[in-house]
Structure formats: structure tokens, C-alpha cells
């Protein structure tokens, strides 16, 4: 059996908020597997839904760049050690330059972006005297004239969002109601941090993991075997409403879902509007 270290117990406590002895017992029960230990604690009712380990310590900036013809958009993050440096002109200029490089060069992965911008970032590190790091990035090309992108930068550049929509008619793209919808959904993604667009695009492994957690919890609580699966199914539906963008309550009116708001806007402009995807970058999640 794997040795259970104090560091493992500490990490599990940070992830779940459970007590030290409970965390140690969980790790012993699952032979040191951290992910299984989280599930074990949840099944016993000793922990809430798994949280990301550690505190947000990253500083930096998320920036967006748009092509002159408006057909391509890029978003990128540049990380540093302190907020003081993040607010400086030199750092902000470099962050904008990174996003522009993603826009112009379409790097395939982090290594490709490092090859493009790594040397310039290193020079800035030497100049400023603080460590910096290229973070996550995304690039999107509008597939047709009837598509648009909503963008939103939140919390002093610590969260950036792109939302992709398609209308049935090209003339709908420039209508104020549609433009406002795109921005509001981008704000929704920033605030509510969905995991997926809809239930169909949700990671099924995550769904089954939630189902099993609640099945085992119901069994631990002594629920009748014939209703355990119903309890688990209900928990999964609740989970989907929390993490799927189209099923989430709208932040401006929680009596409506995002699906409702999109449908209402489409009806108002006489067109069919579809949300096709989104990208979200948050510095603390780097």
C-alpha cells in the first residue's frame, strides 16, 4: 500500500474542506489515490463537490485581438508574479503583442507560441526583474457571414471569454439585440464558468463519476435500493444544469435559462440563433 504523507493529507483537505483525520482515512481506504479519495469523502457526506486544489496566486492579463476584417479573433494570457507588474505599460503591451501573435500566426500549441514569443518575453523578464510565463490561448475564425463572436474581459483582465454564435441570416448579426445577446452570454460564461456548452458535449466520464458518487452516498445513507438510481439520476440532472451553459439560469433573470434567452432574442429579430461554443481563460486556473 502507498505511504500516506502529510502533504497528501494537506492537499486533500484543500480540495475538499474535510477534516484532517477524515482525509487520512480516505487516503488509506483508496490506497493513496487522490481522486478516489475525493469521491470517497463525498460518498460519506464529508466533502462538498471537489474544488481545485490550492489558492489562486497567478497574476497577469488576458487580452483579445481582432483581425482588421473582423473574421478572426484571438485570446491569450500572459502571467507574472505581481499585480504591480501586471498593471504596468510594458507588461500590458507585451500581453497585447502575444494575443496579436496568436491572431496572425495561429500557433498549434504552447510550444509553437513559445517559439514565436518566448525570446521577447525573456527579454522583458530581464528588464522588469520578475518571472513571466505564456499562458493559455485560443483562436477562432468565423465560419460564415452569419456568425459572430461575443467577447468579455472581466476582473481587470483576469478572466477572458469568447462566445460563438450563428444566425440564420447574415443581416441579423449586426442587430443590437443580437450583439447584446452575444455580450451577455460572454458575461454569463465569465461569471458561471460552465464546463460544456450542453449535455451532449459534456464529458461523459464526469457525468458517470457524479452519478456514482450520489449512488454510493444514497446507499451509505440507507436509502432503499429501488430508489438509489432515481436519486443519482436527479443529482446528474442538477449537475448538468449547473455546468452546461445552455441549461444554466441566466444571470440577469434566473427564471430563464440561456436556451430561453437565445430563443426569445431569435423570436424578437425574426431569426434562429444558435450558440455553437465558447472559450474561457482564467488566470487562477492556469
Curated annotation (Swiss-Prot):
Species this chain originates from: Desulfovibrio desulfuricans (strain ATCC 27774 / DSM 6949 / MB)
Keyword annotations: Cytoplasm, Elongation factor, Protein biosynthesis
Family label: Belongs to the EF-Ts family.
Region (Involved in Mg(2+) ion dislocation from EF-Tu): 82-85
Any one GO cellular component localisation term in the record: cytoplasm
Compartment(s): Cytoplasm
GO molecular function: translation elongation factor activity
Role of this protein: Associates with the EF-Tu.GDP complex and induces the exchange of GDP to GTP. It remains bound to the aminoacyl-tRNA.EF-Tu.GTP complex up to the GTP hydrolysis stage on the ribosome.
Protein name according to UniProt: Elongation factor Ts
Amino acid at each position: 500500500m502507498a505511504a500516506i504523507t502529510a502533504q497528501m493529507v494537506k492537499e486533500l483537505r484543500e480540495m475538499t474542506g474535510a477534516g484532517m483525520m477524515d482525509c487520512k482515512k480516505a487516503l488509506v481506504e483508496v490506497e493513496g489515490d487522490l481522486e478516489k479519495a475525493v469521491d470517497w469523502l463525498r460518498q460519506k457526506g464529508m466533502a462538498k463537490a471537489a474544488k481545485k486544489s490550492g489558492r489562486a496566486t497567478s497574476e497577469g492579463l488576458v487580452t483579445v485581438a481582432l483581425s482588421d476584417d473582423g473574421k478572426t479573433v484571438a485570446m491569450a494570457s500572459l502571467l507574472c508574479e505581481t499585480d504591480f507588474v501586471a498593471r504596468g505599460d510594458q507588461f500590458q503591451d507585451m500581453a497585447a503583442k502575444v494575443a496579436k501573435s496568436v491572431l496572425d500566426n495561429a500557433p498549434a500549441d504552447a510550444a509553437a507560441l513559445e517559439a514565436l514569443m518566448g525570446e521577447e518575453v525573456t527579454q522583458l523578464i530581464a528588464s522588469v526583474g520578475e518571472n513571466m510565463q505564456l499562458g493559455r490561448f485560443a483562436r477562432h475564425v468565423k465560419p460564415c457571414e452569419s456568425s459572430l463572436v461575443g467577447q468579455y474581459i472581466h476582473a481587470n483582465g483576469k478572466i477572458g471569454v469568447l462566445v460563438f454564435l450563428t444566425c440564420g441570416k447574415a443581416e441579423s448579426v449586426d442587430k443590437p439585440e443580437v450583439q447584446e445577446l452575444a455580450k451577455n452570454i460572454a458575461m454569463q460564461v465569465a461569471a458561471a464558468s460552465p464546463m460544456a456548452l450542453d449535455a451532449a458535449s459534456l464529458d461523459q466520464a464526469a457525468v458517470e463519476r457524479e452519478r456514482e458518487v450520489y449512488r454510493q452516498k444514497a446507499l451509505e445513507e440507507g436509502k432503499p435500493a429501488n430508489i438509489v438510481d432515481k436519486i443519482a439520476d436527479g443529482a446528474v440532472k442538477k449537475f448538468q444544469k449547473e455546468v452546461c451553459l445552455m441549461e444554466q439560469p441566466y444571470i440577469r433573470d434566473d427564471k430563464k435559462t440561456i436556451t430561453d434567452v437565445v430563443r426569445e432574442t431569435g423570436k424578437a429579430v425574426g431569426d434562429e440563433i444558435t450558440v455553437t461554443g465558447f472559450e474561457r481563460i482564467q488566470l487562477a486556473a492556469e
